[in-house]
């Protein structure tokens, strides 16, 4: 797992922001079982996954008065959402997705697609939460969506006034 800004070729370092935000990630394999880190480098954490299917990571991060609920998924074979906010393919390997928030389609939400060669395009989910993207080049694609809920609460003794859910989906295209 790498953390950073794909479009800017930025990978956060363990002795910088990555070390501050990646405190206790929950990583699950396709079977839903938790994975433990097997290796760490200056800018990554490795989680061994066996078998086929998507791997998910979730990590809450509090920034001032906002609780960030970060979720990431690698792969587009699972057609059922498991994260609070998740782009779910309509069929395994499909370029049509439904943006789910807590199990229900999320309409009229911006989804940004990043792809080679540093290409970026914004889409909006329709009234049924669906988007259809194009993947014109071979290589890695990253999709990102966010949703804010005005909901106050506390975590680890710190108050927040809203929750910002951020979800990324990463997959590779071969042609």
Language model features: what each stretch is:
Residues 3-40:
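N-terminal, post-signal-peptide region of Sec/Tat-exported proteins
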Residues 22-33, 110-122:
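Short amphipathic beta-strand segments in non-cytosolic proteins
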Residues 35-39, 121-126:
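Short beta-strand segments within Ig-like beta-sandwich modules, predominantly Fibronectin type-III
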Residues 41-46, 125-139:
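Glycine-centered loop-to-beta-strand initiation motif
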Residues 48-63, 140-149:
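Short, aromatic- and glycine-rich surface loops/edge beta-strands on solvent-exposed regions
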Residues 64-95, 104, 117, 159-175:
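Beta-strand-rich domain onsets/edges
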């Amino acid at each position: 797992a790498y953390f950073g800004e794909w479009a800017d070729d930025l990978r956060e370092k363990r002795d910088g922001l990555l070390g501050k935000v990646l405190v206790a990630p929950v990583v699950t394999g396709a079977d839903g079982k938790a994975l433990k880190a097997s290796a760490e480098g200056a800018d990554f954490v490795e989680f061994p996954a066996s078998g086929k299917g998507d791997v998910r990571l979730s990590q809450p991060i509090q920034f001032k008065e906002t609780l960030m609920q970060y979720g990431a998924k690698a792969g587009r074979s699972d057609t059922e959402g498991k994260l609070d906010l998740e782009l779910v393919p309509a069929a395994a390997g499909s370029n049509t997705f439904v943006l789910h928030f807590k199990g229900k389609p999320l309409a009229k939400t911006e989804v940004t697609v990043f792809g080679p060669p540093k290409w970026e395009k914004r889409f909006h989910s329709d009234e049924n939460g669906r988007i259809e993207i194009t993947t014109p080049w071979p290589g890695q694609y990253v999709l990102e969506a966010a949703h804010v809920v005005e909901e106050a609460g506390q975590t680890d003794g710190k108050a927040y006034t809203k929750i910002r859910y951020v979800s990324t989906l990463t997959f590779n295209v071969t042609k």
